[in-house]
Amino acid sequence: MSHKAWQNAHAMYENDACAKALGIDIISMDEGFAVVTMTVTAQMLNGHQSCHGGQLFSLADTAFAYACNSQGLAAVASACTIDFLRPGFAGDTLTATAQVRHQGKQTGVYDIEIVNQQQKTVALFRGKSHRIGGTITGEA
């Protein structure tokens, strides 16, 4: 595990009101890699009593954000897709694992898998990142 990747994740998390509001926790970090978790609450359920797709997207997007900023170079999403494969329910602990597939000078491609506590895939997300200049902690 990269100490630098953890530093960058903690620096971002300090200002990440959305991740905090959703109860997202950072579990593991490395360069181009992040694992985050979230427990589905009653407030996250849709009219079918399953986890709202927007909440799943936010979990995957958070893992993506930490992975694509793990090297300390500021990056944002330029495009994202998600496939919902099975529902999450209240009380489920969902884990999103993000891995870099390609990182160029400016753009990157990251795949994120969300699994439930039975290790069954809930959603697959692909994010494309774009480096915007600047650094996360003031040093790259």
UniProtKB/Swiss-Prot annotation:
It comes from the Bacteria. Keywords: Hydrolase. One of its GO terms (biological process) is phenylacetate catabolic process. Optimum pH is 7.5-9. Pathway: Aromatic compound metabolism; phenylacetate degradation. It is an enzyme of class 3 (hydrolase). CDD domains: PaaI_thioesterase. Its EC number is 3.1.2.-. The keyword DNA damage does not apply. InterPro entries: Acyl-CoA_thioesterase_PaaI, HotDog_dom_sf, PaaD, PAAI_dom, Thioestr_dom. GO terms for molecular function: acyl-CoA hydrolase activity. Induction: Activated by cAMP receptor protein (CRP), integration host factor (IHF) and by phenylacetyl-coenzyme A (PA-CoA) that prevents PaaX from binding its target sequences. Inhibited by PaaX. Homotetramer. This is Acyl-coenzyme A thioesterase PaaI. It comes from Escherichia coli (strain K12).
